[in-house]
Amino acid sequence: VRISYRVIAAVLAVLMSVMLAPAANACSRVTWLGPDGAVITGRSMDWPYSFHSHLYAYPRGLEQNGAGGINSLTWTTKFGAIVVAGTTDPEGPIDGIFDGMNEAGLVANLLYLGESDFGPAPADDRPRLSFAAWVQYVLTSFKTVDEVVEAFTDPAIYVVPINFGPGGAAKPTVHLSVTDASGDSAIIEYLDGKPVIHHGRQYQVMTNSPTYDEQLKLNAKWDNVDKNTDLPGSIQSADRFVRASYYLNNLPQTTDQRQAVAGVFSVMRNVSVPWGVGDPEHPNLSPTYWRSVADSTTKIYYFESALSPNIVWVNLNNINFAPGSGVRAVAVEENYSIIGNIDTELKPAAPVRFLAPPPNPPAPAAPGPGTSESDATGTTEQSKKGFGWWWIPVGLAVVAVVGALVRPLSRRPVEAATLAATRAPIAQVPPATPVAPEPTISDRQTSAADASSIQVTYENNALGEGEQDGTDKSDSVPD
């Protein structure tokens, strides 16, 4: 009986862990430091669904709003940038920026981190910035990693976590990597509401969970392994970290720019998740939709869609980032007709309207006599966490499994009594009398299968709609 109850507890623990697992991306990022100061950063974007990604060109001198709700951060762009923007909901508009490089060679990459915790909204009036605008703020405001680290060491800006995706089921648990043209890097994570920053040229690899300090410990045992060592090959974050570190360290120190870019792309493909492959029990492990490589030395930004055999790129040296030049964009994730240099494919577009928290949420009703606060507001602590619709079938599975395991235990009183009798002293055992055998209880199996297919349609965000929202502030690139 004890063993059975332990089995029940184990099953419940596993199922609850699945219920609490967030659907999120499992991306990877590396930075190659070559001879003569060459710096090239690559990343992969792994996700359960397409972001319908576009490349956007943002000019200098453009007024921006960080979509943070109350006390939302506003700023004027100091640097032009090429960024990857997409939809946080497959049926919604383009409302987030996840990756990119500015004209100074600063690169920013937003990746998933399950342990991320931005903390509760502050009671003071500090500026607030939507997590969907975090990359944009960094790339259009700073030139070096030192400047970024200084800006986020003192939490003068609150990064607002906003649930997104279908039904708002996805949690914005992310961390940020930044790399500049000198090769300096930083990993910025928010844990327990406070920024934790790893700053230095040595931080060349980043994946996902666990937290970065734990990733470094896990990777340490693989340092200095020879080329005959069998590397871990799963799609788990820790395994991707090991492979990325190993192959990055074994890339040739070439001065050939083509070979250098090819080397970084090859590492990113090695840690990518094949198309259509994932872990159904862990929705945070999803196929790779696209890869990017940003050359901070030549200022060329490359993009590769998993569904296209063509690599495209933008040379930032050829883009007009002058104030008043306007925002331009081109679809890249699902645009199969483009190839090679696409500088001229960038067409006028409206600026991205970033994902923002719901405006003016209704105040909860005061609880009456005999009414709890959760009854008055219509919420519970569990519903506040926003598990999403998918926990319902999992919850039913929990009930079914527990019922199947407990039912046989409750139907065995005769066996229990017989066992107790056999353990009693021999002198106390009465003469045996014939006992009719108890009817055998046949095993029962219950199974349930539920399959559904959701056809998601997507309407591309109209490019070129709306007027340019910006004012001229400067005619030159600041130092």
What is each stretch, according to the model?
Residues 369-392:
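Extracellular Ser/Thr-rich, low-complexity/disordered mucin-like segments
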Residues 1-9:
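Bacterial N-terminal signal peptides that target proteins for export
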Residues 9-19:
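Bacterial N-terminal signal peptides
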Residues 26-126, 159:
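A contiguous strand-loop segment
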Residues 61-76, 115-158, 327-336:
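Compact, glycine/acidic-enriched structural inserts
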